[in-house]
Amino acid sequence: MSSSSATKRKKLHIALFPWLAFGHIIPFLEVAKHIARKGHKVSFISTPRNIQRLPKIPETLTPLINLVQIPLPHVENLPENAEATMDVPHDVIPYLKIAHDGLEQGISEFLQAQSPDWIIHDFAPHWLPPIATKLGISNAHFSIFNASSMCFFGSTSPNRVSRYAPRKKLEQFTSPPEWIPFPSKIYHRPFEAKRLMDGTLTPNASGVTDRFRLESTIQGCQVYFIRSCREIEGEWLDLLEDLHEKPIVLPTGLLPPSLPRSDEDGGKDSNWSKIAVWLDKQEKGKVVYAAFGSELNLSQEVFNELALGLELSGLPFFWVLRKPSHGSGDGDSVKLPDGFEDRVKGRGLVWTTWAPQLKILSHESVGGFLTHCGWSSIIESLQYGCPLIMLPFMYDQGLIARFWDNKIGAEVPRDEETGWFTRNELANSLKLIVVDEEGKQYRDGANEYSKLFRDKELHDRYMDECVEYLETHAHHEV
């Protein structure tokens, strides 16, 4: 690029609209901050409660990031004040999608009035690309998922889809699909495939499938951004470009988050002070950190095995057990086994409010992460070389676990049909990863990968390339 063309390039106005889940909202916010650091104006669109719950934006960027609140329409069966997936049980999420689709008019009016150069959107607003096209606004799809998982879900291109029969049988999801041309162990266990088919491939209360949403938003975009990097998923990124017949699939890098300063944590630093006191008393590299995201609702039976497995391991543990804000469903009614807290007193800490995950993972006493395998959690853990004890439950979590299994951690053994695991299997997995000699390979692997995951310069270069694409391909550029 010549210096004269760079000089002529105008500052852009870029809007971002993530799906109503904080596992999506936070990576979108990281992208927004990087765009703002390049001097471009950003409009970050969500609903009022979600905007209020965002982490504090650095003061240097607040003049460039406008937080746009569009009220979520009232929908029957959706609790009042429920504006994100963490606010509702899993079976109510389709009603959140109905409300999300009700944002179409507000989004359309915003785009018409503000005429941004780009809108970067998620998988959910299937109606958005045609609106942007009609208004002459460029649009980009940003996938917060990793490339290997997205390849497993297949092509969204009409030309490619016609070459393969649609997957309708369970066994088609429990082996690597035919369009993956290289050896792969990424596939679903039967219990995961059942949940996937129920939740993704059949129309829900919103009237459309998640598959339709994904196809519409990818096929309607000019560029496909994805939270990945070539150092980890090079062949998968090439395959993704081929599958979707998109000339441009750009990795954003991993967007590794930085440890927040005390003035950026929304007044929650007192939580960390208490946690740090406890962690400081523990032996280096021996604490199990256990957390399963904000959406998981566990049955009492599964909950018991988790608790008793942690106890049986004999290891010190810090377990984040967040009560769901919706006040209903399995996750709200589960109770710790009788006498559990007394038996683990001093060795195990059960934490029931917000916890600063990144700070915990960065603490030297933490030696293993018992995780549901959300992509953001994997990235945060491997930044600090923390090996994984993997216990996936839904969505793409099983695919991510297969990708990393035997590299930087191991999955807890389970019944493949039901997903059941026992306290003994969990305890053995915890000890393997954190203290056993046989687990040293996983600890070493996680430590080696940490160099790549925390390489801020590398990941910033990926985002720089994405921003450069936005700068040179906006419809409104003069």
UniProtKB/Swiss-Prot annotation:
UniProt keyword Translocase present: no
Membrane-protein topology: Single-pass membrane protein
Enzyme Commission number(s) from the entry: 2.4.1.-
One Pfam entry name: UDPGT
Domain of life: Eukaryota
Keyword Zinc found: no
Primary localisation category: membrane
Annotated PROSITE patterns: UDPGT
Any single GO CC term annotated in Swiss-Prot or TrEMBL for this entry: membrane
CDD domains: GT1_Gtf-like
Residue runs in coiled coils: none
Gene Ontology molecular function: UDP-glucosyltransferase activity
Transmembrane segments: 12-32
Residues carrying sugar: N146, N204, N271, N297
Keywords tagged on the record: Glycoprotein, Glycosyltransferase, Membrane, Transferase, Transmembrane, Transmembrane helix
Subcellular location: Membrane
S-S bridge residues: none
Gene3D superfamilies xrefs: Glycogen Phosphorylase B
Family affiliation: Belongs to the UDP-glycosyltransferase family.
Protein name according to UniProt: Putative UDP-rhamnose:rhamnosyltransferase 1
